[in-house]
Amino acid sequence: MVYSYSEKKRIRKDFGKRPKVLDIPYLLSIQLDSFKKFTDQDPTGERGLEAAFRSVFPIKSFSGNSELQYVSYKLGEPVFDVKECQIRGVTYSAPLRVKLRMVLYDREAAAGTVKDIKEQEVYMGDIPLMTDNGTFVINGTERVIVSQLHRSPGVFFDHDRGKTHSSGKVLYNARIIPYRGSWLDFEFDPKDALFVRIDRRRKLPATIMLRALEYSTQEILDLFFERVEFKIKKDTLVMALVPERLRGETASYDIKDAEGSVLVEAGRRITARHIRQLEKTNTTELEVPVEYIVGKYAAQDYIDPDTGEVLVSANSEISLEDLAKLSLAGIKELSTLYINELDHGAYISDTLRIDSTTNRLEALVEIYRMMRPGEPPTKDAAEALFQNLFFSEERYDLSKVGRMKFNRRLSIPDDEGSGVLSKEDIVAVMKNIIHIRNGFDEVDDIDHLGNRRIRSVGEMAENQFRVGLVRVERAVRERLSLGDLNELMPQDLINAKPISAAVKEFFGSSQLSQFMDQNNPLSEVTHKRRISALGPGGLTRERAGFEVRDVHPTHYGRLCPIETPEGPNIGLINSLASFARTNSYGFLETPYRKVIDGVITDEVEYLSAIEEGRYVIAQANIEIDANGRMAEEQIACRHKGESTFMRAADIQYMDVSPQQIISVAASLIPFLEHDDANRALMGANMQRQAVPTLRSEKPLVGTGIERTLAVDSGVVVVAKRGGFVDYVDASRIVVKVNEDELRPGEAGIDIYNLTKYTRSNQNTCINQRPCCSVGEPVVRGDVLADGPSTDLGDLALGQNMRIAFMPWNGYNFEDSILISERVAQEDRFTTIHIQELSCIARDTKLGSEEITADIPNVGESALSKLDESGIVYIGAEVKGGDILVGKVTPKGETQLTPEEKLLRAIFGEKASDVKDSSLRVPNSVKGTIIDVQVFTRDGVEKDKRAVEIEEMHIAQARKDLGEEFKILEEGVLSRARNLLIGAGFTDAQIAALPRKDVLIQVIDDETKQTELEQLAEQHEELKADFDKKFEIKRRKITQGDDLAPGVLKIVKVYLAVKRTIQPGDKMAGRHGNKGVISKICPIEDMPYDEQGNPVDIVLNPLGVPSRMNIGQVLEVHMGAAAKGIGNKITAMLEEQRELAEVRGYIKQVYELGDEVQQRVDIDSFTDDEVLRLATNLKGGIPIATPAFDGAKEKEIKQMLELAGLPTSGQLKLFDGRTGNEFERQVTVGYMYMLKLNHLVDDKMHARSTGSYSLVTQQPLGGKAQFGGQRFGEMEVWALEAYGAAYTLQEMLTVKSDDVNGRTQMYKNIVDGNHQMQPGMPESFNVLLKEIRSLGINIELDQA
């Protein structure tokens, strides 16, 4: 493998055994691709905005004399960029402008004669845009639209598993689900009649549907039944024989062959042998007794040729009298329906008998009554309703997917077709459900991923947009029909409000539009790759059963079987597997390597769940010989959803990678294969809650996916093009681009601005730090700057801690964690949290609120941190209760006495008519002010601070753009100098020229002169561009803000809080091993090894066996080896050993392992590169052990040997307090520990007095409401058990809801009288009222 300069700084030793066939695809593509399809112009009009417009336009007036046609659309440029939108609290969106054409037809002339055409561009609201990282900024906050897993449109066959009817009979049903429109269900009842339901309303016999589709009784019977033909003889009947139909029946008469010999005697069962004999003798007719036909059903109407009377009607039961009538009328032939109990049921025949309708109109009326009960049906209304239900393109759409699924399920060869249903479609569904009831076909599995599809952002946004357009359509149609159209333009017809409202509602408040989880890069990526079965059109938590939540065989490689929330949403919210993607229909597919005649190729194909069932697929971990053939005879593989063994020759595909089945979060867990699934689930979920630490540290034991994740998450800065680093400071990196990557006519400079100390959605800190230095070569894709939780481009969620597994005085009982004081001293788990506090000045009825430093009844000391505008300084250290922004609110005018009026007149206005409503620091918070933003309404005068901030921003913008210009200008000038040198100028001559004069020199060489002129032009363009950019920036900064109605000014104060680790904080490893810190122990008391090095953390060994997450023990051993190797390299460098020796040792480490694929060629490194690598490996050599393909026990032992550690992984430890050796050796090593976002500071809370609930008068609950501690039923039992009667009494009265008692007690305490008199608790009065409301009067007697 070839490494770039920056990748050589630190290389992960990879223990993966399998070659990499396919890189993990871009992790956010599901979001970005979907939204791109929505906004991009699509000439075919099959998706996105184009499809929405085409489905609604043209809109015709009711009279047909005018119509509004759609021509094209274009999205404008957003006003503010993403960062500006976040600061200002507005939506990052672009205006949508649509070109519409209004066509007026001439009423008098022939139809279709155009009288007038008007074209105009119409504004149709703003469309929120997706940022580069797959998020949306809505009202200043980043949100993610989660993809939804819903039932695919199409037709599904199912049964009720015998739960509906008490007999336990299985009732089959079929359901046609469109993409939009009414659902159509067919179902059997316990008597085997077929019924139909529309939109889950009351059921009707299914034949009503057929009659409404213009089928007669005769046609219905012919569609669903075969016939049995009889010839009527004098005393007997001759039946046309189809031998196959007799199988399994009991002969009720002697069956004779053509010669007249008896084949089957009466009363005997007819077997396959008898049928073969009948076929052999070519028997085509069979004489049967007359009684045989009794009870059969006529296949058609039989009419007396003379009188026209119906003798036997179709589907009626035939009796001997009927037969006599037919004989009399001279009818010689009779057809009956072929029905048998086994596999040709009489379902439709029975249904026709309970169907009360006889013709189409009656059927339509019946359907109308069911859909619109209580409305009087008319012929036209019934006709229109039925037509609109399933046959109108406006109301019903199966969609492309639905049609494909429908046709494939019913074995119709074509995948394309109409979006509405046809008569044939409905008949085919009825035939199929009867086919299933007869036992010829299977029902569908609705949890199969071939029957569930993904709806992503683009599709959902398109649907919402269409909803808005449909609302507009109604209004437009009315306006086209009214008024004088000659005067109107398209702009006057269209009101963009409904469209904006629909889009805004979707992005702002849909269940699937979620506040982005921004704890760390992993939580961002996972949130964007989440697949939810909830949401509009999906399931609900309460109704979802066990089957839907369970792991299905088709999840393999598509949805992760591990990562799902614990709790009520388990199994309903899933995560996309690492390599999965959606196909054009929205079904999930996963990649496989093709296998041809037992040889594994590198050709990769993506298969959906439907296609996968047809093939035999081997796992990724099968043995392969040197020629790429499978080494074993019998191969473990999957076929039709079952795991089985097959011969190598039968294998058609093979997995791409062992990590294929799991999500990115799960594939971050090293030694995942040794962990129990439940704990792996917790591990995957808890990594998302890790808070970025002050100094990120890469995991010593990783899985090799860390870099991919960090880069794809978008938190690191990645080089767009190769070149050399020209300039670096804390907030900017400048790269001089390689000549061969330049676009013609550009300066060849890439400038990367870094994000500094901004607040994330979870109040953690987002900050980027450069990780390259001036002069370094850069290639495209190199990491230039680290973001939160990344270290040299690797994801780094926690810290490597030295761990010992041993009990320690009960401080690690029940998963508690004992940590060393050194961890806190070195700030290993110190995190920065940024809080945003807002102060809003409003216009009230009594006058406007004012932000000022002149606050009534507040001492000087409280105002010491405010400036003259009443806003806190940046850099001020503040604590709970300090004023951040001074604000006064007008009070209601009070009647003044004459004396007060006189005093006022003499001494001027006193501050008695305003009250203090300043923004103060919340009680439990202590921190530093890092930023202040002031937003002022348009037309309101800006205060001094706002002007200062504005000037600062303008100066900063000028400086940034100026530096950018200077860098770009230097790029142009240096190229001009090179030209001049090439044209014969000397360095001295060029140095003597004034800086800008380089561009105006005259050269003899004409081509070079032209090039120089082009550079001069480019320089002018740069200057003009700079002025323009600066002007735009200045205008943005100085313009007033668009604030909510009634708001005059908003001041936002950003407060940085540093949180060190402390008892009560929650920590976890990556294997689901979580715990709470019980004690921070002095370094000298911690257990230490023979060299005197104390451990950092002591964990309880009892946390491992019952949880079955052995991966953590292996991680500790491997971590010990990795760190040990780092220590050895450190020692070598400190002793200044020969570089060859260092190189040899590093090479030995990277070469270790049996069949390791990713070896590193250390020999090709230069001495400098080896030295830099060694320096970066001092802290330990990072290791990758991919999931299901990781390091083996033998390799861990080899690593421990290389590090000079015992291969048992255990050390002698000594007690820090006594110095005595512990009885047994202890497992000591390095584990990657995370600090989770469940901090004790956010949870710790106490209350003295506060707010009470209105009804019960008990204190509220929870920190947010400043509530009390609940003293529940069990706590009452505890006090009862101790007989602590008085304590219990005060708990239930004065400390809870005895209103008079508690106020009296407060007064007593103030007076220094520590007495209490309990009274009646309010909850007792509530109980009395409840009982009285039931009509039982209770009166209390005075005791």
Swiss-Prot record:
Pfam name, any one: RNA_pol_Rpb2_6
Keywords recorded for this protein, A-Z: DNA-directed RNA polymerase, Nucleotidyltransferase, Plasmid, Transcription, Transferase
Role noted for this protein: DNA-dependent RNA polymerase catalyzes the transcription of DNA into RNA using the four ribonucleoside triphosphates as substrates.
Family label: Belongs to the RNA polymerase beta chain family.
PROSITE patterns with a match to the protein in the record: RNA_POL_BETA (PS01166)
Record EC number: 2.7.7.6
Subunit description: The RNAP catalytic core consists of 2 alpha, 1 beta, 1 beta' and 1 omega subunit. When a sigma factor is associated with the core the holoenzyme is formed, which can initiate transcription.
A cellular component annotation (GO) from this entry: DNA-directed RNA polymerase complex
Organism: Shewanella baltica (strain OS155 / ATCC BAA-1091)
Protein name: DNA-directed RNA polymerase subunit beta
GO BP field: DNA-templated transcription
GO molecular function: DNA binding; DNA-directed RNA polymerase activity; ribonucleoside binding
PANTHER family in UniProt: DNA-DIRECTED RNA POLYMERASE I SUBUNIT 2
Domain of life: Bacteria
Catalysis performed (reactions): RNA(n) + a ribonucleoside 5'-triphosphate = RNA(n+1) + diphosphate
UniProt cross-references to InterPro entries, sorted A to Z: DNA-dir_RNA_pol_bsu_external_1, DNA-dir_RNA_pol_su2, DNA-dir_RNAP_su2_dom, DNA-dir_RNAP_su2_hyb_sf, RNA_pol_bsu_bac, RNA_pol_bsu_CS, RNA_pol_bsu_protrusion, RNA_pol_Rpb2_2
